[in-house]
Amino acid sequence: MPKTLAEKILSRVAARDAKAGDLVIAPVSRVMVHDSVIDAVMAGLRDLGKEKVWDTTKVAVFVDHAAPAPTPVVADSHRVLREWVRAQGIATFYDAGEGVCHQIMVEEGYCEPGTVIVGSDSHSNSYGAVGAFGAGMGATDIAVALALGRTWLRVPESIKVTFTGRPRKGVTMKDAIMRVVREIGTDGARYACVEFHGAGSLPQGDRITLAGMTTEMGAKAGIVVATPEAPDWLFPDRGAAYANEVTVDLSTLEPQIAVPPRVDQVIDISEAIGQPVDVVFLGSCTNGRLVDMRQAATVLRGRRISPEVRLEVVPSSRRQFEDAMADGTLLALSTAGAVIGSSGCGPCLGRTGGVLAGQEICLSTANRNYRGRMGSADASIFIGSPYVAAVAALTGVIDDPRPYLEASEAEFDDLVERRRSERAGRGAASVRSGDRSRELMVAAARIGVAAEIDD
């Protein structure tokens, strides 16, 4: 019987012929744990009567979600975590400032293609960027995996996503995956494995963006087919059965915007032009890499951000941070007015550094925009690419980055001045009123996305 990638991987690791719907006991090649759930994980191990993890060489621990510690309570939790890591003898430990767990897991080679990796974070799907079956799990399941070195899984059905064509300048794979989320919806891949075809030759960072955002469709895993790291056997069989198939033509795609408060409320940027923003966040496991910062610097180098906007830049790992320092990218962003944060999750989940106030409007390159994600439940979060983020920081409004990337110096300055003037003409009361955000929610509803609009 022809197999999908998920069926192949789980059959191989479980040493049995497995198909979608079967239950398997799967050995794990690595377990990832981070600071947000470590207390519950340690409690789970105690409940299991286990003092030691099954293999200290196959456990990776990170302090990234609330780092550096924002409160004494969190600082105490981090202290306990460090003591536990030392007592266990776990060598693979990344403390505050080293970066986001998912970026480091892939970047440092901890993810082996064709293996099962479980993590205490929903975006552990990111490990599919190199052909691994990465899955996020709760604290109890992670404790069991740490104790036994294996986990149970139901083999998921698979959804095939195929990319064709080449994206135009100013269009990124963040736009591509947002379009996929729009097509599938936040529940359309529930407990499925999303297979990406036509993306294997992409840079590793783009593949992390694709695999990681499958979480936003409800997926159990997301795997890029035919990556450079993949062994010869790691390909889906011809004739494998898929629950759904989606094709995205990159050559006709324009930049995409996710409208709050749902990540699948995605519209073309042409429908969002002029939406004012107060804060721009460039970072996260989705888009905090050197290539993302370089894209932003392409727009911002030699210029200053709008006085109406705060720009927060958080590299996804120390390596990305140092590479961006070495080539002048971070200097360009800092000179433009950005606040540069230490490597980690930053304000993405609203637990440290740069949280949003009530009524503030943010353009984020992260992966989630539900109410309260980055701070106040009364704030609004739009999601876009690094190019879109940079233009928003510069002008104070959401705009299509493509004209800026093609413009002469004089044309560029004219575009910026025009957008800033338009925002100023609206007045502060208009910016805070949310009228434009409401219009965009209605626009999202028109394209068949269920918009949530509160009075």
For each feature predicted by the language model, list its residue ranges.
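Fe-S-dependent hydro-lyases/dehydratases of central metabolism
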Residues: 1-455
